Amino acid sequence: MDIRKVKPCIKSSAFTRADWQTMRKYQAASERSGFILLPGKEVHARSPLFFLNANTLIIMQDIYIDIETYSSVDIKTSGAYKYIESPDFEILIISYAINDGPVITIDLAQGEPMADEFEEALFDPDFRKHAHNAVFERLSFRRIGYDIPVEQWYCTSVKAAYCGLPLSLDEVSKRLDLTNKKLDTGKALIKYFSCPCKPTKINGGRTRNYPWDAPEKWEMYKEYNVYDVLAEREIDQLLKQYVIPDFERQLYILDQHINDRGILVDMELANAAIEVDTIYTDVLMEKSRAINGLENPNSPVQLCKWLSRKTGDEITSLAKDQIPLLISKYSKDKDVVEVLETRQKLSRSSVKKYYAMINCAMRDNRVRGTFQFYGANRTGRWAGRLLQLQNLSKNHLENIELPRELIRAKDWQACEMMYDDVADILSQLVRTALIAPKGMTFCVADFSAIEAREVSWLANEEWRMDVFRGDGKIYEAAGARMFNVPISAVTKGSDLRAKAKNAELALGYQGSLGAMKRMGGDKMGMSDTEMMDIVRKWRKANPRIVELWQEVEDCAHEAVRYQRRVVGTPRNLIFDCNGEYFTVTLPSGRSLFYRNPRFVERVKNKQRVKLLCYDGIVQETKQWGDIDTYGGKLTENIVQAIARDLIGYSMLKLEEAGY
């Protein structure tokens, strides 16, 4: 039977919950194998056709969409939500393709009506809506009255990230070597038609370019839009065999709801903080200028020259870690000390996050779109956008409400009298500018030492798990084992605890001397010899973790070398390789993807060794390139990914509970 000719027996709106669960199961099976097993028969199933049972068939279809828009709001600084909220926002061009059909373009900017076929597909729940960075299309259509549930949207950007590829359509096009690559004419055309322009005599004083101002460019813009649809469809087809698990799908939907809700900002505090910072910066500059007479007392070049003249020594750096050393060295010279302390305060004075809040806050004073789903390749952790909420300054003050009210009242003098460093207070108050609506409580929750717990569980390091089952004081317990002393000797503030903490933070993923230094071991006064001794002691105290690194590396090498499935001893992780990808499947069912795995020869410790290598975004350069990996690094990816899955699972449970 050619099932492509079979019509659906029922519409999806009539499905029960059990029907949907059955369909999802068959959908996953069909996309993995191309076949569905039914009672007593085997039926070939090409997406988008899925059987619910032997007598019922639903045809799920795909529509691929890309749009070009206009708004006077800067999307880079204010985000997509505020960009789309702008009163002058409009959709200029829509291009779409249904299944394998031709790409159709609707020129809304020049008065073309919305196509009936497009509207029907958009509102039909049996159509999966695909777009690259689908949140933008979803919000744009909602803005013009086409409110399509997030559950019906599928993002090729997320799919690419899941498969170890970059997020941007342009970069994915290059890495997959698409037949229909994204055109490189887009940036100039977007700037011309989708952004405001400066009024000039040449353009007749207009503040915006319309299609009739440059008809040839407009045709190029429409062509550019068409190629985006072709590119995203090709991406979807090339990656179709790699199925995103249902758990990930649920998380994506939750992520979209969280970003849609946004977070409320205390605009009065944010505006007051910026005003106070402006005044306080001027006060500090005048204070420093009165001593050194410099035109710009905050200029490192000018200040270094003045300090060199004043001290008789050559001062070449005012880096953050150098200023305390200089203050200590020249402590008897009051002018030098005061100038350096003022410089410290000026360097701490940063109100960028307050500006970001104001730039991104919408009419209801909420900031939306602050989290990027699957922003980190492989681990799948969220990335911060706009406000960088994962990177906010901590507040250490016990009574945070007092300085908060002083800043809201713009009383910086009282704040300085009570706390001395107003810049530091402004930094600590950033978190408090994010507030709950009236009648609600803003709760912040996180796991405690989750990576240390994860690596202990993964390696089955029993003594560490006993610590976490008890008081959780891993630094004290590790110090006692490493230095062979009673745990009572490893107390908070002690040298032994500090060294154990440094080791715990640095060495869990096969780190050595370099890792100890990155975590500040040398700044604690430890020599290279002492740090290497701590490395040996930590590894001796954690033999199962050391074995875990080797087990993970061995499984990875076996999977890639022989291109076969390997079930690893660490908690039955599944290592697999099909030539195109090396994957590690986690307990959640999610896989970590490493593209184009291969072995390369490198010189390490003056010896030529073979290392596992893959293609990815190099962390240091943020560019696509070769990445070497090894047991400890793979362990880090696995641990962080499992930790992310646990957070994701908890988020789903909290959402279900009504938080």
Each model region followed by its residue ranges:
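A short acidic-Thr-Gly-centered motif at the start of a beta-strand
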Residues: 55-60, 120-123, 425-441, 652-656
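Conserved "right-hand" nucleotidyltransferase catalytic core of DNA-directed polymerases
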Residues: 59-75, 93-95, 181, 188-426, ...
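Short active-site loop/helix that positions an aromatic residue
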Residues: 135-146, 163, 305-308, 448-462
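Generic long, charged, amphipathic alpha-helical segments
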Residues: 478-492, 610-644, 648-658
